[in-house]
Amino acid sequence: IGGKVWYVEGDERARKLTYKDDLKLLNIEPPSSDIFCGNGFDVHAFCEGDYLNLAGVKVPFNKAFKAHSDGDVAIHALCDAILGAAGAPDIGQLFPDTDMKFKGIDSKILLERSVEFVRSIGFEIINVDITIICEKPKISPYKDEMAKTIASVMGINRFRVNIITKLFEKSVVRPAFSVIER
């Protein structure tokens, strides 16, 4: 390398770490590997309207979701997943539809409050993965805007938010298990 080399006498107290087992000499606790994962699910019936609120984005459609809030099924499921991972009550308990202060509320506010709550009790949200099962309207053109909206509300990097869209594809479970159906 071009520099001078010196010989330095070692000291018994200066432990050298050569092998993986030598790390035991440091006597430190390993980092926690506790990762908590939540799962959320939500459905709403349709009513008269001209758009659906999905993941914080107004998607043009010939109907709307019937709900006490704005009916955003994606955000409601996400809130339940976040709260569930922390062992907290679900959004129905924290933001009940019997409380008029939540009538017509923007679901992004519910998400913001859910995130604030889990952070206040010591949790960190690493990433979110949202699956929207929907025949119509077509959701794919809105996925990036949805991910940006969710990331902004949650205060996390956009690339830590994943939006997946799925179809039933004429599955036999469709009549018994519908999330969004025309």
Language-model-derived ranges and their functions:
Residues 1-35:
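Conserved alpha/beta core of the MobA/IspD/sugar-nucleotide pyrophosphorylase nucleotidyltransferase superfamily
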Residues 43-58, 154-160:
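Acidic-glycine-rich active-site phosphate/pyrophosphate-binding loop
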Residues 59-69, 97-102, 168-170:
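A short glycine/serine-rich beta->alpha loop
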Residues 70-82:
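Short alpha-helix carrying the canonical HExxH Zn2+-binding catalytic motif
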Residues 81-124, 135:
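Glycine- and Gly-Pro-enriched alpha-helical subdomains that act as flexible
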Residues 129-138, 143-171:
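Short, conserved loop-to-beta-strand elements that form functional interface hotspots
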Residues 171-182:
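C-terminal edge-of-domain segments
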